[in-house]
């Protein structure tokens, strides 16, 4: 039986998420609720835990209180055999300054690496929606002999200009790492597709530590993992690509295999929710063999009264629909929709209240938003723009606790 390598997980969760405003006005991006029962960070943590990686440091910074609390309450491990998932705010170990970039966050947290002394380090982002078995990527990294392995997802070449792109040879060695190039490269076996970086990396520990320390002495660096560390290791011939399509997750369907979404904008966040609601969803939340774990609340079941109806929708625990109609929507816990109200193509976070006869269409309502009787949202975008944020795609976004 092959012994498992000693692996430390580092999750980069300090993102500010300006493009998701107003959802990030009062919380870090990885703490934004998603899918009716989760926060964005639950996807990466579920992937790591399902793979058996139970020593994980989550590096936090921006408005991190709700994120730190969620990790501490939801992701408590037994502590048996040194298992832990711990939030690590900026410690200012190297002087009175906060993290200046993702690489600097790791630099300021190298004491955690030295304490754990792992053979390999997985460095994953905290704000993508997907399933992945990181163990398969680690094994690929070991077999490749590279210093760093970058997860790449195949995207149409015509759309790849929006991503950090990977140019690799037939052996998988990365020859160029290009940030949003005007002319993206093809993959070795398909000129019409491009490897886009998923922001997930596996490092041999010494390679990461040496690269982080060298970068810290470069005054011209932005101290960013994707912008500085990876290109430097590509130039040194130390980087390889891991093809995400080769990752086989137990219980995945043909429809959701290979699903990965960057939800960094309001439109992308909205679209990812719409991927959840069909009879055969593009992303299946109900895979019991590779579960996504979230906070467990002691709530009553959802209730539908006086002919309340929900079609092609996700409805969270504790929610009540009273003579209301919900279509193609995701409702989190404790949502109340009153008589005669209509909700279509919308995302409602915990504690939202929709008054009698109100209409909500193509909208994202943050926690504890109250929509008064007869109010109309998402129908007249010109009027909505005077009151709320409206995305390029016409999605109305209303921040936490707003009364309308």
Curated annotation (Swiss-Prot):
Residue sites binding alpha-D-glucose 1-phosphate per the record: 99, 164, 179-180, 197
CDD domains the record matches: ADP_Glucose_PP, LbH_G1P_AT_C
GO biological process, alphabetically ordered: glycogen biosynthetic process
SUPFAM superfamilies in alphabetical order: Nucleotide-diphospho-sugar transferases, Trimeric LpxA-like enzymes
PROSITE patterns xref list: ADP_GLC_PYROPHOSPH_1 (PS00808), ADP_GLC_PYROPHOSPH_2 (PS00809), ADP_GLC_PYROPHOSPH_3 (PS00810)
InterPro entries in the record: ADP-Glc_PPase, ADP_Glu_pyroP_CS, GlgC_bac, GlmU/GlgC-like_hexapep, NTP_transferase_dom, Nucleotide-diphossugar_trans, Trimer_LpxA-like_sf
Highest taxon above the source species: Bacteria
EC code(s) of this entry: 2.7.7.27
PANTHER family to which the protein is assigned, alphabetical: GLUCOSE-1-PHOSPHATE ADENYLYLTRANSFERASE (PTHR43523:SF2), GLUCOSE-1-PHOSPHATE ADENYLYLTRANSFERASE-RELATED (PTHR43523)
UniProt-recorded name of the protein: Glucose-1-phosphate adenylyltransferase
Organism (species): Rhodococcus erythropolis (strain PR4 / NBRC 100887)
């Amino acid at each position: 039986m092959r012994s498992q390598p000693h692996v430390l997980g580092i999750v980069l969760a300090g993102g500010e998420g300006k493009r998701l405003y107003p959802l990030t006005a009062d919380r870090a991006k990885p703490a934004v609720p998603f899918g009716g029962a989760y926060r964005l960070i639950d996807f990466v943590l579920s992937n790591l835990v399902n793979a058996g990686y139970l020593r994980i440091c989550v590096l936090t910074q921006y408005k991190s209180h709700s994120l730190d609390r969620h990790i501490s309450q939801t992701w408590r491990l037994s502590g048996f055999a040194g298992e832990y998932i711990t939030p690590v705010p900026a410690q200012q170990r190297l002087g009175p300054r906060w993290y200046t970039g993702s690489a600097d966050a790791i630099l300021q947290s190298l004491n955690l690496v030295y304490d754990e002394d792992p053979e390999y380090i997985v460095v994953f982002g905290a704000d993508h929606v997907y399933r992945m078995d990181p163990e398969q990527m680690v094994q690929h990294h070991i077999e490749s002999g590279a210093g760093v392995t970058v997860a790449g997802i195949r995207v149409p070449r015509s759309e790849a200009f929006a991503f950090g792109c990977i140019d690799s040879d037939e052996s998988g060695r990365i020859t160029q790492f290009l940030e949003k190039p005007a002319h993206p490269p093809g993959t070795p076996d398909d000129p019409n597709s491009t490897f886009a970086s998923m922001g997930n990396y596996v490092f041999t520990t010494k390679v990461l530590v040496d690269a982080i320390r060298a970068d810290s002495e470069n005054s011209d660096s932005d101290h960013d993992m994707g912008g500085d560390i990876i290109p430097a290791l590509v130039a040194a011939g130390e980087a390889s690509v891991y093809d995400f399509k080769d990752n086989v997750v137990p219980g995945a369907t043909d429809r959701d295999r290979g699903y990965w979404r960057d939800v960094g904008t309001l439109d992308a966040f909205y679209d990812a929710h719409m991927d959840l609601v069909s009879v055969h969803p593009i992303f299946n939340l109900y895979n019991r063999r590779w579960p996504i774990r979230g906070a467990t609340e002691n709530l009553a079941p959802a209730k539908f009264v006086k002919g309340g109806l929900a079609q092609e929708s996700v409805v969270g625990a504790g929610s009540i629909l009273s003579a209301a109609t919900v279509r193609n929507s995701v409702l989190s816990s404790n949502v109340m929709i009153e008589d005669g109200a209509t909700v279509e193509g919308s995302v409602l976070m915990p504690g939202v209240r929709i008054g009698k006869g109100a209409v909500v269409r193509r909208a994202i309502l943050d926690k504890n938003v109250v929509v008064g009787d007869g109010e109309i949202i998402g129908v007249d975008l010109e009027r909505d723009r005077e009151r709320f944020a409206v995305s390029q795609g016409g999605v109305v976004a209303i921040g936490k606790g707003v009364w309308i």
